[in-house]
Amino acid sequence: MTFKQALLLAAFCLLSITTHSATANYNVVPLPQSIMMTKGKPFVLNESTAITCTTSNELMQHNARFLAEYIADATGIKLAHTTTVPKGSGHILLTIDNKIAGKEAYRITVTQKQVTIAGSTAAGVFYGIQTLRKALPVATNNKVAAPVELPAVQIADAPLLPYRGMMLDCGRHFFPVSFVKRFIDMMALHNMNAFHWHLSEDQGWRIEIKKYPKLMEVGAWRSGTVVGHNSDVDDHQPHGGFYTQEEIKQIVEYARQRHIEVIPEIDIPGHTKALLAAYPELGCTGGPYTVSHNWGVHHDVLCVGNERVYAVLQDIIDELNQVFPSAYFNIGGDEAPSTRWQQ
């Protein structure tokens, strides 16, 4: 084979790769309640496709932006999104349909001319977007954009449970804001709507409380970590960190745009050695206390007979109410031995 022939063959192979259409697969997790394949040719998703959202609703506009980002990330196809329905065919319509029962329910209709994702609320539309997103094949070949065929279908779905949550424990191990956002993204991908954020532990205090700076200066840090349960091996590596109130607001907003409610947890009266290390007068013995290196249940807890404890907790809750809009606030309440109270 001559060099010229080899070059032509390589060009032909590249052309065949970049123009080959992939096909969407609606067998996703969680599986929609109803998937009815319909007659008709598939919708071809390509770079001439537009995303249309005619409402000015803020969350719906976020939905349109997310869909464009998801498609670009999965397929390499970059789509524009508009607020007016374009002439002709070849667009994805995001719309609110008040006839759909259930505030998180959605419908997806795919025809040759159009894809329609409808929900009774912006949240429903968002979950429809997640289903469509997961149905797309993931591009290889360095994200070379190639058309994707969406088989004609009618999908109807709604969540079985109103509360679909995941908990992230940042008390025992601190995770950066970027990780927390990635965690929220994974929740959104699986249609979850409640982020239970565990923010205090014997091993660390993770929230900025402006009235009590020692919580960040002392309670947020430990000088080492026991490696494994029932072990005496300490790595002696400092570990810690905390989230500023501005970072918390940023995360709450990030979650809201993805239709996820952030529910904070401050564990009391047990699991409070980090708090006691910062303010030992809140314990029954007066300390000194240290931020815990090891795991398990500790006998040093908040002193329920100390009126100062209730004043401090009220101050903490008052500050957190300024950054967490959720109607729910988790106070733990588990594993609080009464040993010190009885002494």
Language-model-derived ranges and their functions:
Residues 11-13, 306, 343:
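Polar helix-capping/helix-linker motif
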